């Protein structure tokens, strides 16, 4: 994996950076490279390939169009595509969401876990990371979140997130089955 790619619009500079990454990889008996990707699956990943006129969200990088051009000229190919979208609240239909949520609650016996404080949120964060690891484990290039990383992310993100913006859903047996931040 390589990440944190930043360079001027000069193909020779990009080539020198990528060649250095390849050299380091060979020193460690690695036979392929992918990127840009962070150290873990919780870090930023990917290369912006469209939408250069929009502001990136907090979990994605912004790249100038020449990044894509340089990497293509150096033989890199797109492996996957992700779409980052914004939904305008004025276009939403809350009554439809409420009706759907109620139908799901009745049919499957799931319930929203009340977490009005950060302390209440923290009680569910370990189960959240367990679910995250289980859910994403089938994806190519996924690296499970270790206990040390889990502790780091708890300290880094949970204290500044408003508890009202974190939701947990549990099944009839009290097992966490869904979360949203």
Language-model region placement:
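A structural signal for short, well-ordered beta-strand segments and their strand-loop junctions
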Residues: 31-38, 79-86, 168
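A short helix-loop-beta-strand connector motif used in the catalytic cores of GNAT acetyltransferases and
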Residues: 155-167
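Secondary-structure transition/capping motifs at alpha-helix termini
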Residues: 25-28, 160, 170-177
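Active-site-proximal structural scaffolding
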Residues: 14, 60, 64, 78, ...
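Acyl-donor binding region in acyl/amide transferases
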Residues: 1-75
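Conserved GNAT-fold acetyl-CoA-binding loop/helix
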Residues: 137-154
């Amino acid at each position: 994996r390589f990440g944190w790619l930043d360079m001027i619009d000069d193909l020779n500079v990009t080539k020198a950076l990528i060649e250095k990454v390849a050299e380091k990889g060979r020193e460690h008996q690695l036979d392929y490279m992918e990127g840009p990707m962070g150290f873990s699956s919780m870090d930023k990943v990917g290369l912006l390939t469209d939408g250069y006129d929009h502001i990136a969200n907090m979990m994605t990088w912004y790249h100038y169009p020449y990044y894509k051009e340089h990497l293509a000229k150096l033989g890199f190919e797109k492996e996957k595509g992700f779409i980052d979208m914004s939904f305008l609240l004025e276009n939403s239909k809350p009554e439809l969401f409420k009706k759907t949520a109620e139908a799901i609650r009745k049919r499957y016996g799931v319930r929203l876990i009340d977490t009005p404080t950060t302390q209440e949120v923290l009680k569910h964060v370990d189960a959240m990371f367990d679910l995250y690891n289980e859910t994403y484990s089938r994806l190519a290039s996924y690296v499970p979140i270790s206990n040390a990383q889990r502790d780091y992310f708890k300290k880094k993100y949970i204290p500044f997130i408003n508890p009202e913006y974190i939701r947990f859903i549990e099944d009839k047996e009290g097992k966490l089955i869904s979360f949203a931040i």
